[in-house]
């Protein structure tokens, strides 16, 4: 048994005496339910000379109570109940439980809930004192659940003490955990400790197994003694109670004791705990070590904190996988003691002991630096990093860098992040792809394009296989920010990298962006580069160029483009790649008519007729009238006979001669 293994703890008997309970109606004190002054309700205590009710009168009040509850008339129901209690009478069991359950409802405003809970408490306390057999266990549970929602710790504890005083023994599992939750939410488990002790005494003295607190309750009591009250005597009492009741401890039980022993500097006791854990078959020491760290931090014994961390690493397994809360507590202690050098030393020593299989985010270095970042001590994280480099000659694990990089990413400090990535690469370490992608995305969001390019180059140099995500992020960001010149330069840099999938759509995006911004020569050069690298232009490529040329009134360039595409769509194989459609026919016709290239325009018309593409002639009539309204055939005949023929053919086709 657990009791027998702790030789230092002498047998203690449960005390049958308990602190004096508050008055049954102390709930009427405003402090129990609210910090605001409240008008006191009259007590439910019957008058000294109660008036006896006749059977008819009692029946009438019960009927009123029943009807009021059904109609949800709370005040009327309460008045009927008060009338009965004023005559030292109680309604039947069903009505009592219905009333208390109704009053325990949490609907409505905060003030009305508080008022109803006072009445529910008063009713329950009165019934417990007068005739507890009328009160159902489930009604008590419902009332306590409402008190939990209302965070009414005082009334909840008063109700339990009232139950004990009047020997109304409700099974512990119906109310124990609720009271624990209420006390915990109220900020302290110390009040629960008294309830725990009394429940243990009743279970033993009255031989009531159902009143026995379970392991969860025992651990809550231990937490109160060790973590909050820091009382060795009370903790030993709880352990003795667990032994008497046959409650087997778990890792959490040992953890609370480890905290207290570390807090008090009782190293021998901690050694005893470790031996006891072996005896109980607990292989994991993670909870034990975490609590020891907390205790040593609280006592200011930072050397012992370092020893525990390094010892946990020597043990291997999950023993060193401490929680974020533990690392935060640890970091606070060291920083408050101005022991940044000690933190750096701990990380360096830990790196020597950590297995190569330990994940980046499971390392001690990651835990400490991540805690610094989470606590807002980013400057301290830098200081630790610099101190590690100074102490270890650059032997800094990747886990130390990751939290700082994530913080930079979150704060969009992308230039600093990029500089740090360069340092990481030069030290021979390699970042995870997800972190690199996140940094590139942050750089693009921050419009720090230089950092994004630098990070991408670093990924390429480190032979990262998956570059697709970052490539798309950069291209999309540049497009959204209308930086086609950077898109072109970036594409030119990566186009021959087999890990990057470049396609015609990427070239089209650059061409479109150049045309949209009026940089037609850059668009033309990009188009030539695209063709040179054997990327096949498609209809979207040509549409972007045509629209750009029309906007800049560069109609001759459209003619050159038509002559180029005309040859392609003549062959069957090329036609499959660059097939004329309605949009492309419309764009070419409009531009060629506006430019006065009627011969080419009629070639487009012929192609559209061959491919059975519908053409709306009205649009080109308008284009002709806007641009060539004053064009005279006699003058044109003298200068260029062929052009005149093309003009006549176009006018006949468009219906301009009628």
From Swiss-Prot:
Transmembrane segments: none annotated. Residues 1-23, 39-61 are annotated as: Disordered. InterPro entries: Pentatricopeptide_rpt, TPR-like_helical_dom_sf. Residues 50-61 have a biased composition (Polar residues). The keyword Repeat applies. Pfam families: PPR (PF01535), PPR_2 (PF13041), PPR_3 (PF13812), TPR_At1g68980 (PF25245). Gene3D superfamilies: Tetratricopeptide repeat domain. NCBIfam families: PPR. This is Pentatricopeptide repeat-containing protein At1g69290.
């Amino acid at each position: 048994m657990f009791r027998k293994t702790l030789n230092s703890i002498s047998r203690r008997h449960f005390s049958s005496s308990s602190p004096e309970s508050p008055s049954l109606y102390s709930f009427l004190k405003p402090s129990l339910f609210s910090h605001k002054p409240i008008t006191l309700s009259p007590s439910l205590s019957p008058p000294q000379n109660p008036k006896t009710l006749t059977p008819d009168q009692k029946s009438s009040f019960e009927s009123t109570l029943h009807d009021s509850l059904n109609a949800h008339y709370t005040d009327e129901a309460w008045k009927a109940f008060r009338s009965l209690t004023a005559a030292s009478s109680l309604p039947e069991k069903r009505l009592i439980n219905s009333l208390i359950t109704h009053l325990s409802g949490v609907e409505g405003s905060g003030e009305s809930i508080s008022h109803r809970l006072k009445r529910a408490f008063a009713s329950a306390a009165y019934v417990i004192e007068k005739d507890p057999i009328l009160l159902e266990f489930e009604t008590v549970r419902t009332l306590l659940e409402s008190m939990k929602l209302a965070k009414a710790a005082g009334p909840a504890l008063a109700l339990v003490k009232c139950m004990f005083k009047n020997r109304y023994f409700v099974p512990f599992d119906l109310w124990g955990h609720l009271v624990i939750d209420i006390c915990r939410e109220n900020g302290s488990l110390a009040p629960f400790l008294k309830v725990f002790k009394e429940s243990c005494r009743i279970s033993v003295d009255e031989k009531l197994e159902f009143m026995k607190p379970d392991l969860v309750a025992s651990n809550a009591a231990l937490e109160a003694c060790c973590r909050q009250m820091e009382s060795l005597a009370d903790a030993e009492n709880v352990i003795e109670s667990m032994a008497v009741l046959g409650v087997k401890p778990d890792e959490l039980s040992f953890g609370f004791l480890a905290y207290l022993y570390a807090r008090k500097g009782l190293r021998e006791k901690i050694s005893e705990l470790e031996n006891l854990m072996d005896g109980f078959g607990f292989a994991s020491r993670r909870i034990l070590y975490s609590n020891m760290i907390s205790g040593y931090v609280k006592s200011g014994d930072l050397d012992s904190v370092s020893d525990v961390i390094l010892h946990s690493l020597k043990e291997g397994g999950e023993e060193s996988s401490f929680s974020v809360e533990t690392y935060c507590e640890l970091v606070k202690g060291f920083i408050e003691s101005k022991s940044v050098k000690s933190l750096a030393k701990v990380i360096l020593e830990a790196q020597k002991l950590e297995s190569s299989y330990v994940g980046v985010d499971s390392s001690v270095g990651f835990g400490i630096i991540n805690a610094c970042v989470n606590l807002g001590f980013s400057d301290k994280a830098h200081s630790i990093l610099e101190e590690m480099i100074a102490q270890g000659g650059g032997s800094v694990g990747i886990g130390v860098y990751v939290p700082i990089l994530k913080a930079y990413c979150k704060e969009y400090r992308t230039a600093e992040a990029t500089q740090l990535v360069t340092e990481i690469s030069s030290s021979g370490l390699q970042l995870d792809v997800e972190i690199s992608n996140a940094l590139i995305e942050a750089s693009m969001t921050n419009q720090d394009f230089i950092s994004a390019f630098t990070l991408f180059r670093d990924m390429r140099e480190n032979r990262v296989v998956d570059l697709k995500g970052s490539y798309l992020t950069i291209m999309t960001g540049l497009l959204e920010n209308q930086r086609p010149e950077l898109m072109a330069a970036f594409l030119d840099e990566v186009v021959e990298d087999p890990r990057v999938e470049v396609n015609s759509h990427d070239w089209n995006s650059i061409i479109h962006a150049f045309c949209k911004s009026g940089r037609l020569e850059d668009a033309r050069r990009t188009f030539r580069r695209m063709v040179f690298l054997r990327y096949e232009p498609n209809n979207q490529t040509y549409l972007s160029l045509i629209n750009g040329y029309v906007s800049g009134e560069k109609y001759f360039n459209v003619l050159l483009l038509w002559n180029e595409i005309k040859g392609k769509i003549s062959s069957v194989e090329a036609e499959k790649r660059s097939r004329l459609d309605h949009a492309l026919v419309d764009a070419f016709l409009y531009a060629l008519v506006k430019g006065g290239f009627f011969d080419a325009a009629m070639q487009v018309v012929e192609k559209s007729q061959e491919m059975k593409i519908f053409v709306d002639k009205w649009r080109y009539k308008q284009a002709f009238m806007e641009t060539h309204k004053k064009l005279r055939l006699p003058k044109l005949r003298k200068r260029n006979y062929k052009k005149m023929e093309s003009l006549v053919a176009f006018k006949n086709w468009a219906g301009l001669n009628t």
